[in-house]
Amino acid sequence: MSQDLQKEVASRKTFAIISHPDAGKTTITEQLLLFGGVIRSAGTVKGKKSGKFATSDWMEIEKQRGISVTSSVMQFDYNGSRINILDTPGHSDFSEDTYRTLMAVDSAVMVIDAAKGIEAQTLKLFKVCRMRGIPIFTFINKMDRQGKMPLELLAELEEVLGIESYPMNWPIGMGKELAGLYDRYHRVIEQYRSEEDERFLPLGEDGDLKEAHAIQKSLYYDQALEEIMLLDEAGNDFSRERIIAGEQTPVFFGSALTNFGVETFLRTFVDFAPAPSSHESNEGVIEADNPKFSGFIFKIQANMNPAHRDRIAFIRICSGEFERGMNVTLTRTGKSLKLANSTQFMADDRETVNRAVAGDIIGLYDTGNYQIGDTITNGSKKLEFEKLPQFTPELFMRVYAKNVMKQKHFHKGVEQLVQEGAIQLFKTWRTEEYIIGAVGQLQFEVFEHRMRGEYNSEIRMEPIGKKIARWVKEEDADEKLSTARSMLVKDRFDQPLFLFENEFAINWFNDKNPDIELTSLL
């Protein structure tokens, strides 16, 4: 790989934004896009009433509800870096999509509501990042409202998440009393709601302002200085190495809604966020600077443009250089493909991409060739990157087309939406009736909404009373083993499994069939 290409790869910053719903993830995403010059104004998302929708929330149901249920991909340039943001679903029912997205990034930005601290979904997603060793940058949001005390939030970060924290800035007051941010890294105080030429006030060597200023009269100014002194003396030492290893999280305070502290965060993040990292494969570690092109499909999205009924496969480029029109091998099938139709995204806006490098996320128009987890490369034809996570569903519904004359629409819709991985498909063993499985109820609602809106197919769903899926070997697939509390079905790859009513039904099955091994997904 040439030095120019190495430099280009090193400039990539590919990260996901993770949070509990309503922590402000979408708002901060919009502010980042604002600084990247991609949009001219940021609108806040609160669903139907406002009529304003976030740039990253492009699907109709997201606009209606004000939540993210799919992962959007956005790209822009900032201070010499190419930024690739993946805005993940905030709703826990779509955690599988989020987990797959986290396989495609090099770092994560964790957004926390200052009033609520660490919430359930935040904790789940943090654990995945930690498990993968992904560096985590923390943005404590909504400082323009009353919330928990900053020292309390730091203690919660360290105790609940078990990670070292290092505050890069520190709030001077909060809520109505918010006066500014003490920036430990840039050695300035950033004033809240100030004129541009007075926004940043330089600090002296003693840690106080170089020149007297009205902000020093704030009730919370002296308190902030005392807390900074405490952090300097008793807090963690700053360590770039520990940040990159995912063992220390830099903490930024601010308000995405009022756009306070966001650009400072972005500027600092670009300095410290890692460049594209290596990826594990069946042929060893593939480094980003490997000259051979390779990448994996982490997401498939149908109907991003409903007028065209298209399907886009999102690929994380792991190594080398992509050029439009290049030939690659889809290693799962051994099939040779020409990558003639490729695109980059800003939510639902797209443009043709002619080249991209390791770290970039691109979309490939898919006519049915790809599956989530596929590897494509112009190198070794046997290369496969590590498997992407797949969750065992916990809710199951039989699904039918209400109008038997529209079976074609029904089957096409089910098949395409299942291929996206947001819902799983099973079929009854002999009659092959459709059963869909999900992690949470919202997935069924989104499925029904999209079937009606995108495929003109009204559906009927009926609970089947089964909640646990366990796979078996093909030689153990005997329909005679089904009972009132268990039923034999097959997944979309024709692998056999039993759906059980509860743990008691599983234990009963195991007692009766001790030689049959039951396995689950994640």
UniProtKB/Swiss-Prot annotation:
Keyword GTP-binding: yes
Domain tr-type G: 10-277
Compartments (UniProt record): Cytoplasm
Superkingdom to which the source organism belongs: Bacteria
Any one biological process term the GO annotation gives: regulation of translational termination
Protein function: Increases the formation of ribosomal termination complexes and stimulates activities of RF-1 and RF-2. It binds guanine nucleotides and has strong preference for UGA stop codons. It may interact directly with the ribosome. The stimulation of RF-1 and RF-2 is significantly reduced by GTP and GDP, but not by GMP.
The protein, known as: Peptide chain release factor 3
Native source organism of the sequence: Listeria monocytogenes serovar 1/2a (strain ATCC BAA-679 / EGD-e)
